């Protein structure tokens, strides 16, 4: 128990110490303290056999792994002064005994418990010492003599016995394992209390040998008494009280004078304001002081001494009235040393076999569990011995270092050990020969340097192999450097195709196609180079000006791609255009070939026909223009040879393949229309197309292509072939006349080619209004491009506005006029070759048409549904630019330009 209220008095000097801070220190442990703490834990009572033994073992194991050396102190015979206290404690723990016995100081039951603890300490090799009397007295002796660095006890009597450092409130909490530390040096410096003062407090306040102390004297009065003596020995003062029991008579106090309320010195504030203060050494006014300031005047000094004497007289009166005061026996118990060292403190190696037997008998632990728990103490003891150079044959030998570990911020190593002698393994795993423990890295390296050297060598070799494997490992995700990309691009060339139109029978594409949509999509893309309505004149002009068509094709493709990007980046662009371009599936098209026989089927597009045609024309035509250049270079070595073109004319090949089809292969709509258009031929369901006239063959092709969800004619928006077959001759003549007046055709056609087909040249994709009679088309065997536009029903002709029908009616013309028009076109081409200025101007206008293509598409996307009237332009100054920048459709602009040319010719 110690001195009453001692720990409250020493509270200002308490220090919170982590258990790791005790590493390397030797601590004397009061064994009885740990036993009493284990017996008071209610959770262990009834669940754990011998809780004091279990508590003792795990505390030893925990502190030993922290490199804390322990020396246990065994209780001796208590002094007779403690008999009363011991009897009261026994009654409190075990209840009253029924018989009246003389007071004894024996601890028979407690000593039996302590003997069990000593047996365990023998098994673990822990040193212990026997105290002559109290255990804390022996701990203090060991600490004062330098055998240990501190005392681990909760009794404050250790300071009275001469201890220098005391640790109390030992806690193994995982969150904060700590102890409270008190040192005699801090107590003396901060509180002014030495060993004599602490013994005097034990007499006044009470202790184990004097439980009540001096009645009526408490902690506050005792501390005030110590302040009165100002460093004088309290024990000597006790002796003076006994020698002079008479109380000191207080001196007569002088008369109190007036004191200043500012400086607390004699005199009034007004006097100090006028004449100043002598004690403050000021001429006027005075210096203020705090509340605790004591005035040095005679009256205050006399009053203070009188007050202190009253406190001392009060305690002296109570102490002298107490029988046996000043209790010299108690003072001698604390001051006189009875303990001595009988043998040196030594640590022994834990005995594995003895510990197994002890735990099985006392604690009922299985042998394998006891061996597992004792292994850490065995390994640590052997490492410490080897560190100091004491090597024996029975020490544990490590097999290998498994891996490095960290425990409580300390670098450790996981070690695999050989199985020691008498080590028992669990029955379920008899083949386990190696054991694993975690040891401090520095200690293991000092004990087994060879094993650490081998481990480090293995680590370096493993690291070297990893570095070599990393160097030799190919980098799969390595990106090419900029120089490699530039070199690879420099080796790339745009090679022309060897054949523009391989001699393949398009009949296969139509016959093998399971549905008419696929058959329509399988037409050769190279035909589009002849029927591109926008770019044919421009391509021809640029081909004549630039000698290398491949270089020009590359430049033109870049310009068109830039135009497409800028067009797609406009905020007003509809999401329908994006979906239409996505449906094209351009990545699956074999652009190098001449047949789209393997092109996948394209889903029907449910968006607006005009919007789809605009997006398709802007996205596909530039690629087809480049293909036209490549096909032109591959098929003709000399410019202007029309023979090869006629031989590889895809329209004739397509007609030759379609002629083998039967009428029942066509949709019902076309069959009804053919029968109604040619009643004189008496067309049957199984009749072939060979018997039909050439005009009907072309219309059949146009109708079959327009009914598909992805037909060729919808790629050239404004060319609606399934409605304009009746105006074919008039249209062809007008187109040929317009082309002859404005542009030069890239190829020359023979009469035979003119009879079978007519080309559309110079018509914009989205600029022609949806007129069933005047809309531009080819009436004869015309092959159209792939498209994802919606199909156009033939019934739209009946739904067309009546004003359009009456406004754009024109008489039909014969084929002779078509021949004359083509001859006129050849002449105009020859004239333009001689006049490069005109061609360059036309080329410039052609390039400008690319820039205004988006505006034309946005402005005339709905012309097929809401026709508009256009204002013709007859000014001569605007002939060159107005025809290209004018928002009118290209057909109207060509017509106006043709009229202006004729009017100018007549005027001249």
Swiss-Prot record:
Protein transport keyword on record: no
Cofactor(s) needed for function: Mg(2+)
Chain positions covered by the region annotation XPG-N domain: 2-96
Residue span of region 5'-3' exonuclease domain: 208-383
GO CC annotation: centrosome; nucleus
InterPro entries: 5-3_exonuclease_C_sf, GEN_chromo, HhH2, PIN-like_dom_sf, XPG-I_dom, XPG/Rad2, XPG_DNA_repair_N
Compositional bias annotation for Basic and acidic residues: 824-834
Annotated positions of the Phosphoserine modification: 794-795
Keyword Metal-binding (UniProt): yes
GO function terms (MF aspect): 5'-flap endonuclease activity; crossover junction DNA endonuclease activity; four-way junction DNA binding; magnesium ion binding; protein homodimerization activity
Pfam families named among the record's database cross-references: Chromo_2, XPG_I, XPG_N
UniProt remark on cofactor binding: Binds 2 magnesium ions per subunit. They probably participate in the reaction catalyzed by the enzyme. May bind an additional third magnesium ion after substrate binding.
Region (Disordered): 460-482, 629-650, 792-834, 853-886
Keywords on record: DNA damage, DNA repair, Endonuclease, Hydrolase, Magnesium, Metal-binding, Nuclease, Nucleus, Phosphoprotein
Tissue specificity as recorded in UniProt: Expressed in bone marrow and testis and to a lesser extent in thymus, spleen, brain and colon.
EC number(s) recorded for this UniProt protein: 3.1.-.-
Positions of the UniProt region annotated as Chromodomain: 389-463
Compartments it resides in: Nucleus
GO biological process: double-strand break repair via homologous recombination; positive regulation of mitotic cell cycle spindle assembly checkpoint; regulation of centrosome duplication; replication fork processing; resolution of DNA recombination intermediates; resolution of mitotic recombination intermediates
Residues reported in the UniProt entry to bind Mg(2+) 2: 155, 157, 208
Listed Basic residues bias regions: 465-476
Residues that, per the record, bind Mg(2+) 1: 30, 75, 134, 136
Described purpose of this protein according to its UniProt entry: Endonuclease which resolves Holliday junctions (HJs) by the introduction of symmetrically related cuts across the junction point, to produce nicked duplex products in which the nicks can be readily ligated. Four-way DNA intermediates, also known as Holliday junctions, are formed during homologous recombination and DNA repair, and their resolution is necessary for proper chromosome segregation. Cleaves HJs by a nick and counter-nick mechanism involving dual coordinated incisions that lead to the formation of ligatable nicked duplex products.
Entry's family note: Belongs to the XPG/RAD2 endonuclease family. GEN subfamily.
UniProt domain comment: XPG-N, XPG-I,5'-3' exonuclease domains interact with DNA. Contains a chromodomain that acts as additional DNA interaction site and is required for efficient DNA recognition and cleavage.
Protein name: Flap endonuclease GEN homolog 1
Organism listed in the record: Mus musculus
UniProt gene name: Gen1
């Amino acid at each position: 128990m110690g001195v009453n209220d001692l720990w409250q008095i020493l509270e200002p000097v308490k220090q919170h110490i982590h258990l790791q801070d005790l590493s390397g220190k030797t601590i004397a442990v009061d064994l009885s303290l740990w036993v009493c703490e284990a017996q008071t834990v209610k959770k262990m009572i009834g669940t754990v056999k011998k809780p004091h033994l279990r508590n003792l073992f795990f505390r030893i194991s925990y502190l030993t792994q922290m490199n804390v050396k322990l020396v246990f102190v065994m209780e001796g015979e208590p002094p007779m002064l403690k008999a009363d206290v011991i009897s009261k404690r026994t009654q409190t723990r075990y209840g009253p005994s029924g018989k009246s016995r003389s007071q004894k100081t024996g601890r028979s039951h407690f000593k039996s418990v302590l003997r069990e603890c000593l047996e365990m300490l023998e098994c673990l090799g822990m040193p212990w010492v026997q105290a002559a009397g109290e255990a804390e007295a022996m701990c203090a002796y060991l600490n004062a003599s330098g055998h240990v660095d501190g005392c681990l006890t909760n009794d404050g009597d250790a300071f009275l016995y001469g201890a220098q450092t005391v640790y109390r409130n030992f806690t193994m909490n995982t969150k904060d394992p700590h102890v409270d530390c008190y040192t005699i040096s801090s107590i003396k410096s901060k509180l002014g209390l030495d060993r004599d003062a602490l013994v005097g407090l034990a007499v006044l306040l009470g202790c184990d040998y004097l439980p009540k102390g001096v009645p009526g004297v408490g902690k506050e009065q005792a501390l005030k008494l110590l302040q009165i003596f100002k460093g004088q020995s309290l024990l000597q003062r006790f002796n003076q009280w006994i020698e002079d029991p008479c109380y000191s008579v207080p001196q007569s106090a002088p008369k109190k004078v007036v004191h200043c309320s500012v400086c607390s010195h004699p005199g009034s504030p007004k006097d100090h304001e006028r004449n100043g203060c002598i004690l403050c050494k000021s001429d006027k006014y005075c210096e203020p002081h705090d509340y605790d300031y004591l005035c040095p005047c005679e009256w205050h000094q006399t009053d203070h001494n009188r007050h202190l004497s009253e406190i001392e007289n009060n305690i002296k009166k109570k102490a002298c009235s107490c029988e046996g005061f000043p209790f010299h026996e108690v003072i001698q118990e604390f001051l006189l040393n009875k303990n001595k060292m009988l043998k040196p403190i030594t640590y022994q190696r834990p005995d594995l076999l003895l510990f197994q037997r002890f735990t099985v008998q006392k604690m009922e632990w299985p042998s394998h569990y006891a061996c597992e728990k004792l292994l850490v103490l065995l390994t640590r003891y052997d490492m410490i011995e080897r560190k100091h150079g004491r090597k024996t044959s029975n020490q544990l030998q490590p097999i290998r270092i498994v891996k490095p570990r960290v425990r409580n911020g300390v670098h450790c190593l996981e070690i695999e050990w050989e199985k020691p002698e008498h080590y028992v393994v669990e029955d379920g795993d008899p083949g386990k020969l190696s054991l694993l423990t975690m040891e401090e890295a520095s200690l293991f390296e000092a004990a087994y340097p060879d094993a650490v050297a081998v481990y480090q060598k293995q680590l370096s070799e493993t690291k070297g192999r990893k570095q070599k494997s990393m160097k030799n490992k190919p980098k799969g995700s390595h990106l090419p450097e900029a120089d490699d990309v530039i070199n690879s691009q420099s080796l790339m060339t745009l090679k022309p195709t060897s054949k523009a139109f391989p001699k393949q029978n398009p009949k296969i594409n139509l016959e093998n196609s399971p549905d008419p949509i696929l058959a329509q999509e399988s037409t050769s893309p190279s035909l589009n180079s002849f029927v591109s309505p926008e770019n044919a004149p421009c391509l021809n002009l640029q081909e004549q000006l630039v000698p290398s068509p491949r270089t020009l094709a590359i430049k033109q493709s870049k310009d068109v791609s830039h135009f497409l990007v800028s067009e797609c980046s406009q905020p007003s662009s509809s999401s329908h255009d994006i979906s239409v371009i996505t449906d094209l599936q351009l990545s699956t098209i074999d652009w190098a070939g001449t047949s789209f026989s393997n092109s996948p089927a394209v889903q029907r597009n449910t968006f607006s026909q005009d919007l789809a045609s605009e997006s398709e024309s802007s996205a596909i035509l530039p690629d087809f223009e480049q293909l036209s250049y490549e096909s032109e270079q591959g098929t003709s070595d000399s410019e202007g040879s029309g023979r090869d073109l006629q031989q590889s004319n895809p329209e004739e090949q397509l007609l030759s393949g379609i002629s083998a089809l039967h009428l029942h292969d066509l949709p019902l709509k076309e069959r009804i229309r053919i029968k109604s258009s040619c009643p004189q031929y008496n067309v049957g369901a199984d009749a072939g197309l060979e018997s039909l006239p050439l005009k009907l063959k072309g219309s059949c092709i146009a109708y079959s292509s327009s009914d598909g969800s992805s037909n060729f004619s919808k790629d050239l928006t404004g060319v609606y072939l399934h409605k304009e077959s009746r105006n074919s001759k008039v249209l062809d003549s007008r187109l040929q006349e317009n082309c002859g007046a404005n542009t030069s055709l890239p190829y020359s056609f023979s009469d035979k080619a003119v009879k079978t087909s007519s080309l559309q040249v110079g018509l914009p994709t989205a600029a022609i209004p949806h007129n069933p009679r005047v809309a531009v088309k080819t009436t004869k065997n015309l092959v159209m491009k792939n498209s994802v536009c919606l199909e156009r029903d033939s019934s739209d002709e009946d739904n067309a506005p009546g004003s359009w029908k009456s406004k754009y009616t024109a008489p039909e013309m014969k084929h002779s006029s078509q021949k004359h028009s083509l001859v006129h076109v050849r002449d105009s081409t020859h004239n333009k070759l001689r006049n490069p200025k005109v061609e360059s101007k036309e080329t410039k206008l052609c390039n400008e048409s690319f820039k205004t293509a988006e505006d034309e598409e946005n402005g005339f996307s709905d012309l097929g549904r809401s026709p508009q009237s256009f204002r013709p332009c007859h000014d001569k100054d605007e002939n060159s630019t107005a025809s290209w920048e004018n928002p009118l459709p290209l057909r109207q602009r060509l017509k106006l330009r043709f009229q202006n040319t004729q009017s100018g010719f007549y005027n001249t």
